[in-house]
Amino acid sequence: MEVNHQSNDLGLVALKMLAQYHNIPLNPEEIKHKFDIEGKGLTLTSWLLAAKSLELKAKHIKKEISRLHLVNLPALVWQDNGKHFLLVKIDTDKKRYLTYNLEQDAPKILSQEEFESCYQGKIILVTSRASIVGQLAKFDFTWFIPAVIKYRKIFLETLLVSIFLQIFALITPLFFQVVMDKVLVHRGFSTLNIITVALAIVIIFEIVLSGLRTYIFAHSTSRIDVELGARLFRHLLALPISYFENRRVGDTVARVRELDQIRNFLTGQALTSVLDLLFSFIFFAVMWYYSPKLTLVILGSLPCYILWSIFISPILRRRLDDKFARGADNQAFLVESVTAINMIKAMAVSPQMTDTWDKQLASYVSSSFRVTVLATIGQQGVQLIQKTVMVINLWLGAHLVISGDLSIGQLIAFNMLSGQVIAPVIRLAQLWQDFTQVGISVTRLGDVLNSPTEQYQGKLSLPEIQGDIAFKNIRFRYKPDAPTILNNVNLEIKKGEVIGIVGRSGSGKSTLTKLLQRFYIPENGQVLIDGHDLALADPNWLRRQIGVVLQDNVLLNRSIRENIALSEPGMSMERVIYAAKLAGAHDFISDVREGYNTIVGEQGAGLSGGQRQRIAIARALVNNPKILIFDEATSALDYESEHIIMQNMQKICQGRTVILIAHRLSTVKNADRIIVMEKGEIVEQGKHNELLQNNNGLYSYLHQLQLN
């Protein structure tokens, strides 16, 4: 059973549309079987239960029209007569309501009066539980809190070491005070010797503990760094194809490289400076005991540091954003240039490319220089505040000593203590650029880590694929505002059948196979394998059982054997050789000195196009997939290489469902059935000879063009 927009159960239609909006796959047949037992359509209660089963959080409320603009949209307006509709958007200024008429399968704008006439006060708010969890688990600075809790024992050890370091930092000025006020005045050489030995011991302990703290801290932050790096790469590979298609490679690489900024921040002095700053309250208490006036001068300088940082930060952030954007442009241009080096040399456009690079590089250097200048101004401002405070303390301290309110030893001890307080403040102020930079890095990295991965319900325990394929009422477009690529496509393929798909460029041939690999979920309709809706299937389970050979296949910079056995590195050599023979690759591999251990070079640069293609076919066959897709796999080959592959095609296709997409009609003429597509629709299908008999058909026209 396929739920389309002509279904009598508008509740089920609405549920499907809302589920698709929240990127949640839905099996209409399963929902109807579980929750529409009487076959009369979903009731309000059963609708809410069905939504809950899909991990949707649905809440039925009564809401006045005047307060509808406060709710999250889209939402379902529930009608007692079953004429439900979706409320998509509200224009409060013009008092217009954008709705979606489920009966007519079309958007509709209602005036205030029209909406009031059909609104009964009942509305169902729908949100995705997964999206709520995703927002709670959003990658930002709070992500590091669980990591800190996880390694709390190590951080507690670091805190304990920091306490001892601060105690030693407190003792040292006291020793100097005793020397100045007692030893020098009374000429106490024995006391001087004792204090010197004690001070030496304190210094040794301070050095050892400081090194130990740095080691412990670096060790724990390195673990967090490894966890973040591993999570980033796993998440990157789990992102849908659409994420990469909508972004330049250089942009993605630039965002991943932001991990270096976070790493430098975690292992740098910034966090230890924060720990030192936390102990400043103890120092302030001792300093207040020495001289409240001098302490107030120090306290008065702290807002100056803060205000200066607040003034600099927004400007610095804007300049860092500009620097990142220009750096990402450079990264993207560099990747593009290296990838297209053959074209650049063939067309002799190196001067033009160099000119573009020089302009972009100059722009990046200029933005980087502006960041450096502003950071320098910020640091000099901090130095100015520090020097001003030092002069004021010197002048005021000297007055206090002269007036007898403070001894020379106390003044020296106070200055040493104030140095211990101000040092972490100055370091933090000077490292404010790092704080700002790491904040931007976290945001940039969040663009990757907060992007949703490929989703599936994972509730179906699916067996091994047999090979039956069905496309039912498929409608698809790559973006909501993009033109329709596939429109009302219906196609059934029996297991073991060899299907050829032909048509003009842009007719939707490759898109059909992308839906079969679940790179995308159709806007409407179902893609079924052995009767199972692929929207409910684990993408990895599916793709492991489908072999795909494209026109331009990518080989990794590894040996031929490793490329063929990519999905299962421990695969036996017998399986690798069998797949290579089936693909017609064994003979040329045997002729190479290193044989299957030959390194193919980056993207297979050490091999010819035909050799790369045959290795790609072997890689697709080595797992014995029940479904095999050849997407223009032979269109770029010379006739000899194509002949070798076509000779083995009967063996390759044996026991498999095979889909051949080709512009060359000679590639598909022996197929069991040929599908002809035009503008996203199937316009013809049949065997080669049958299609040729239709002189007015597209296939006959394409065949005549190729003959001529």
Curated annotation (Swiss-Prot):
Q: Which PANTHER family match?
A: ATP-BINDING CASSETTE SUB-FAMILY B, BLL6336 PROTEIN
* Catalytic reactions on record: ATP + H2O + proteinSide 1 = ADP + phosphate + proteinSide 2
**Organism of provenance:** Pasteurella haemolytica-like sp. (strain 5943B)
- NCBIfam families recorded: type_I_sec_HlyB
What is a single Pfam family found in this protein's UniProt entry?
A: ABC_tran
Source species, domain of life = Bacteria
Q: What class of enzyme is it?
A: translocase
UniProt cross-references to PROSITE patterns, sorted A to Z: ABC_TM1F, ABC_TRANSPORTER_1, ABC_TRANSPORTER_2, PEPTIDASE_C39
Q: How does it assemble?
A: Homodimer.
Main role? Part of the ABC transporter complex LktBD involved in leukotoxin export. Transmembrane domains (TMD) form a pore in the inner membrane and the ATP-binding domain (NBD) is responsible for energy generation.
Tell me which residues make up the ABC transmembrane type-1 domain: 155-437
Q: What is this protein called?
A: Leukotoxin translocation ATP-binding protein LktB
SUPFAM superfamilies for this protein? ABC transporter transmembrane region, P-loop containing nucleoside triphosphate hydrolases
- A cellular component annotation (GO) from this entry: plasma membrane
Show the taxonomic lineage: Bacteria, Pseudomonadati, Pseudomonadota, Gammaproteobacteria, Pasteurellales
What GO MF terms are annotated?
ABC-type transporter activity; ATP binding; ATP hydrolysis activity; ATPase-coupled lipid transmembrane transporter activity
Q: What is known of its domains?
A: In LktB the peptidase C39 domain, the ATP-binding domain (NBD) and the transmembrane domain (TMD) are fused.
Compartment(s) of residence: Cell inner membrane
* Membrane topology of this protein: Multi-pass membrane protein
